[in-house]
Amino acid sequence: FEDFTPGGTNSGLANFLVGLPDTFFQAPAAPSNIRTKATYIFGQDEWHVANNLVLTYGLRYEYSTPKSDTQGRTFSIVPGAQSTVFPGAPVGLLFPGDKGAPTGSNFPDRNDFAPRFGFAWQPFKNTRTSLRGGFGVFYDVLKAEDNFQFNGQIPFASSAFIGFDGTGVAGPFGFFSDPFGSTGSPNPFPSKPIDHSVDFASTFGPFGGGGVFFVDPHLRTPYTYQYNLNIEREIARKLTLQVAYVGSSSHGLTGLKDINPFDPATLGTANPTRILNETPGNTSSSFSFLPQFMNVANANYNSLQFSLRQQTAKVPVLGSMYYTFAYTYAHTIDFASGFRNNNSQVPFFLPQIFRSSSDFDLRHVITFNGGWDLPFNHGPEKLVKGWSLFPIVTWRTGYPFSVTAGLPASTSQPGPSGAGDRQLVNADQIAPIHYLSGNTSQKVNGTSGFFLFDPSAFSDSPTPPYGTAARNAFRLPGRTNMDLSLVKNTPIHGDRVSVRLNVDAFNIFNHTQFRSVSTNASSNIFGQVTSAYDPRVLQLGAHIIF
């Protein structure tokens, strides 16, 4: 019931009271009965080659049966194949039981062997230096969410969505008495047994669309190589320095790709055609857009890590303390940084241009944390003893971001690689980016606001296919933060009962730190701050420990 219902009252509430709907949707209960079985086998051994050298090695095997529905309610795209289970299905759409179709969402992957190897070596007799390293293969678990996309889809279940037009309708109550007849729509309810002779073209129209997701029948389990090498040296009593290289390389990562985009040669014409077309040049294709989960991406992470760790020790005058100082220089690269976010769609054409820094890439991170038992010795013992201070200090560079052209995902206006990737089109960068502080309101190009960068460096008229501004080519401001906890421990009954009081301060200096900016080149707040991290937060706590 909307305010703008055609022929309505211009009030959603009034339309509801008189029974004048704008749209009507009905769907049956369509439970998913997805089943899978997992088997994991592993073996590991440790070999003490010498007093100063230990080798650890092992092998793991994993197998998960492809997820299947107990009622066979899945389907696959296999171009050129005709279904015998549903003879009226378009060529290329197969179901369990068809030749060339998996019994579930995909064919089995029985190649998931995962070797592991590690070593620890003390090269010098004084045992103050250690060299360690390791390598391993790790397999992911395919998301069950991929299979839930079949839930409630045709031809296994029927649903109805009706948009009403008030023009020429005799009376509003006619909508409710016969919602299907009043609009000329067939009534699919009550649900009937599946008709395997149904003609898809005349009954359902082009198969696919926004509510239908497919799984590549040859989908494989994503896997990651992880490796590290580190050297640790005790440079003083209870003071240890560690330098490490840590990396990983992920392959066969799953992502969405529209496997039926419009033919680039026909884009911009009055009647563009899709690449899966029984009759080339025919604009009435049997398929709409077909988003499919596929092994379409990879990622890697490389880092150099330093740490200096002081174990608890008594320092003259200052008392007992410990701390860890750490610095990480790292780089994470991928094609897409997660499912269902802005760039989760992997383009059919030119996917390589989206390989760049990950959305969560942090190039430099410095942290310091520790504990200090305050050496108060003068005064009543229960009052001056038991005080401790715990600081956490963090400094890091900012996250990357992309400047988009502001084109929403659309099925009627596809992007360069079909439906779902229109929002991947970036703006054109026409000048070097000029970063601003964002701390005070200022006028930029005649617009006042809290700007983090000058928007005049970009144009919202992108150069085909995806604009000239690369993915994640720009950086948000870094972050400097300090949290501090003051703790008082007081024994009440010997060592059996004690009271702990603590005061915690997060962002103790109340430093304004921006976390996001408008990156839509078509927005009227483009380039302006949209959110910040929390200001100072104080927390008081009391605990009885027994």
Language-model features, listed with the residues they occupy:
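Surface-exposed extracellular loop regions of Gram-negative outer-membrane beta-barrel proteins
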Residues: R128-T167, H251-K257, F390-T397, S402
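Core domains of carbohydrate- and sulfate-ester-processing enzymes
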Residues: F1-A27, S76-A89, G152-G205, D428-P455
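Short, solvent-exposed micro-motifs at the edges of structured domains
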Residues: R35, N52, S64-P66, P186-F546
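Repeat-solenoid scaffold signature
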Residues: S105-A144, Y223, S357-H378, L383
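Signature of Gram-negative outer-membrane beta-barrel scaffolds
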Residues: F1-F124, N341-S344
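Short, solvent-exposed turn/loop segments enriched in Gly/Ser/Thr/Pro and often Arg
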Residues: L59-G72, G134-L142, V246-S249, T328
